[in-house]
Structure formats: C-alpha cells, structure tokens
Amino acid sequence: MLYLDYGRQDGQWVPNKYGDNKNLEAIEFFKHLNSVIRGRKDGAIIIAEESTAWPKVTKSPEEDGLGFTFKWNMGWMHDFLEYMKLDPYFRKFNHNKMTFGITYCTSENFILVLSHDEVVHLKCSMINK
C-alpha cells in the first residue's frame, strides 16, 4: 500500500503530486488509524508486515512515523531459514546470517517472525525447510 508502483510495470501507475512513488493517501491512512488505536490506551498491538526499507514504520506519527507498534523483521526470517538449510558443518562459516540483524535491530521495533508465507501455496512445511 505504501508504494504506488508496487507490483506494477512502467505506465501502470501515476506518480503522486511530488512526482514520486509514495502513496500519500495510504501513509496518512496508517498514521491516522494507528493514532486512533494507540489513543484508546487498551493495550492493542499494531504489527506491520512491511518488507521494504520504509523508514519510521514504528515511530509515532508525531515523529513522522507510521505509528505501528512492531514491524516484522523479514530479513531475519530469510537469513534464519537460509542458515538452517545449511549442513551443520558449514554453519560455522555462515554465522553472519544470524548476526547481521544486529546492525539494524534498533532502527525499528522489530519482532522476529516465521511467516505463514513460507508454508502456503504448496510450499513445504516449516520442519522440512
């Protein structure tokens, strides 16, 4: 929702009023929705499944963020699954797959997930990965 050109070819989308690909209406929608939910003070948690490098997903709208409580760390999931596929002997040469996330882990309020996307549409079970 954040990008006007996501999943589209050239000519299939129209730039915003500033000439870029940000979906300004979607950005304002998320900011407003998350402000309302956070304002209720009932302990609701709002989690973004956002796989791009969009900045400030978990910052408050007052800080020009989208206002989500947490963001999935899709990079960690990918690296973790790749690491686990390796023969245990070769893992010692690939520990960077498990430690790379430390370089950006404080940029957002991340949660570590194993996505349902990894097992749907005739993909194998998580245990077989």
PLM regions and their residue ranges:
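Short acidic catalytic loops
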Residues: 1-2
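Conserved alpha/beta catalytic core and glycan-binding cleft of carbohydrate-active enzymes
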Residues: 7-129
